[in-house]
Design a protein with these regions (language model features):
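A broad, low-specificity signal for short, low-complexity segments enriched in glycine/proline
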Residues: 4-17, 50-52, 86-87, 93-97, ...
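A generic structural signal for short, non-catalytic loop/turn and secondary-structure boundary residues
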Residues: 22-24, 47, 119, 128, ...
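Sequence-level motif detector for i,i+2 pairs with an aromatic at +2
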Residues: 25-28, 40, 121, 130, ...
Length: 337
């Protein structure tokens, strides 16, 4: 046995490490594509570590509400119906608007007084942008503190229809996001020819990354949205990543890929297609492996090391974690009564 001092904590702490020791972070989250939710449809969705009822009213507005009626706790996603602009509970036909206010109790001579003062079921703020349904999550029900950015590639003409992909990982959303600043893993896990140079800046809820001298440039907006442009020979393709926190230990990665319309058979069109293939990891002659084939093996089996042992060649992992902490907010402590 060596006589030198031994850091036993370093050697033994892995036994007590957790896989995903985080709550659900605050932010905007993708729920579904707008085209998938029809008028007057009522559907149950699992997101943000619980079940929700998602529905679209007669006018087209989207509501996302806690499933359980404030009356006697009936699940409004099983037998509930849209009545005009309201979601109607199947049990006694109490009706709620998209903000959680009770608007009708058909057999009540006098509405419960609290129904005139506040919402009585929890709902999430919802936006539809870029053909996607988004919800805002905050554990203490605080209003959105930032808005979704403009993404012209999804709203303006002149771009090819998006290619979409969906992948599920058994890990927390922070672990997936942290990959974006772990530049060394691109060489050693993905097999890239080298560790790319990169610059990272943090500004409030936005992280900006410029990698490989402008080859990959983009921004992350909170925990649930990233927009990156890949540029080669003056041709740019865009990857929009909108990851969902399904539970504390399961995340679903959703991505859209697009580029400008180029003439059929043109050099620019071929470059754009190869850039998109590179993003997915399926480009012909690709030197590095795509994330689907290598990252998931790590994510699905690793534990989170809160005090990592880093070297001078690692990316700004600690700075990233400090920035990400702003998205963790405490839920209110409720009385047991």
């Amino acid at each position: 046995m060596t006589s030198k001092p031994i850091n036993l904590k370093l050697l033994l702490e892995s036994k007590n490490m957790e896989r995903c020791p985080f709550p659900i972070p605050t932010g905007w989250y993708f729920v579904d594509y707008s085209e998938n939710l029809k008028k007057e449809e009522v559907r149950n969705v699992n997101l943000l570590d619980q079940e929700w009822v998602l529905y679209r009213t007669e006018s087209g507005a989207v509501g996302m509400t806690d499933p359980y009626c404030a009356h006697l706790g009936a699940h409004m996603g099983h037998g509930g119906k849209v009545c005009g602009e309201h979601l109607r509970c199947p049990f006694h036909h109490w009706e709620y608007n998209t903000e959680g206010w009770c608007k009708a109790v058909p057999y009540a001579k006098r509405m419960p007084p609290i129904t005139t003062l506040q919402p009585i079921v929890r709902t999430l703020p919802v936006q539809e942008k870029f053909g996607l349904i988004w919800c805002w999550y905050h554990p203490a029900l605080e209003a959105p503190s930032w808005d979704l950015p403009a993404i012209p590639e999804l709203t303006e003409p002149g771009y090819v229809p998006t290619r979409r992909g969906t992948w599920t990982a058994d890990t927390a959303i922070q672990e997936i996001a942290e990959n974006g600043v772990d530049f060394a893993h691109l060489k050693f896990l993905h097999g890239a020819p080298g560790i790319p140079p990169a610059e990272v800046t943090f500004n409030k809820h936005v992280i900006h990354i410029d990698m490989a001298n402008g080859y990959i440039v983009g921004d992350g907006y909170g925990p649930g949205l990233n927009v990156f442009q890949f540029t080669q020979e003056g041709v740019t393709a865009t990857m929009i990543s909108y990851t969902q926190a399904i539970t504390r230990e399961k995340s679903q990665m959703n991505m859209s890929f697009t580029h400008k319309v180029y003439p059929e058979g043109s050099k620019e069109g071929a470059i754009a297609k190869k850039l998109v293939d590179h993003m997915i990891g399926g480009a012909e002659g690709e030197e590095s492996a795509g994330f689907e084939s290598v990252d998931f093996v790590v994510w699905n089996n690793k534990k989170y090391r809160a005090r990592p042992l880093l070297c001078d060649g690692d990316g700004p992992i600690i700075q990233y974690r400090e920035w990400f902490k702003q998205f963790y907010n405490e839920a209110p402590k409720l009385d047991a009564a």
